[in-house]
Amino acid sequence: MSHDRFVFLFVAIFVLFLASCRGPTVSPISSVPPPGPRSYAVYYGEKSPAPALSGVDWAIVQDNYPPGKNGRTLYFAYISMGEIDPGTRIAKDISRSPGGLESVTLGKNLFWNSRIADIRKKSFRQALLMQIKRDTKRGFGGIFLDTLDSPLEYGRTHPRQAAGIRRAMESFIETVHASYPTLYIVVNRGFGLLPELAPFVSGVLYEDFCSRYDEVGKHYVTVPAGEREKFLRDISRARTHNPGLVVLALDYDDPRRPALSYPCARMARKEKFLHYVSDWTLTRSVPGPPLGWTGE
């Protein structure tokens, strides 16, 4: 055997040896979800500390609420990504930009007296990013992006005017995730877009999982099973992109007569969702089923 052939054979054997010593290849997304929260609450009141937030792992609050420092609870600052509420810092920031609020308005939400906002507009995106920056500086470990359904519904009814809005929503959340890689992000619903968003978010709030507040009739009602099944399929698809996606089921009920939401707790456990019940103003928690409740 010539010297050159011997050297080549030796190098080849050495490379194979090194390859055999390597550990297993790590997938970008683990098939085993990481440990998540065991409890959560949503509170939009001003009382601090709020009894509803006592001892929970995740707390979703208005961004003017002081995030606690007990070490256990992770606080999420509320940010409306699909609508602009009057009088907010975001509304004031956009008012000072060229074109003002009208330049980013797609329509109106008459019940909440808010504007359905256009995430494609640079001024709106910048205002949102500035709010996120302020919230992280105040000590929030997460953000809660609300009202995703509003621009999605606008896109469904106005497909030409809303061209590109879905991709703009997705790209905005990608930008936030890239800018704040350790920041927890939870979105409210947005199920039609959830599979695309899943790799960039920590969780989804399933508002109106089983019971909700009828804004027209001004009373609490049960959510039809058929409506829920469709969204459960969207969640299942999203979890193929992010197996650790946390689902927070939120229901509404009358604190004085809360039996309407009792079956919801059982449904949430079956789906392995965390469950919370509140009055429609999100300022008062609603107790769950009493001990021994059988559903009869």
Please place each PLM-identified region on the residue numbering.
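Bacterial N-terminal signal peptides that target proteins for export
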Residues: 1-8
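Sec-dependent N-terminal signal peptides
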Residues: 8-16
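C-terminal motif of bacterial Sec signal peptides marking the signal peptidase cleavage site
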Residues: 18-20
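Sec-dependent signal peptide cleavage junction
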Residues: 22-24
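Glycan-processing catalytic domains of CAZymes
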Residues: 26-296
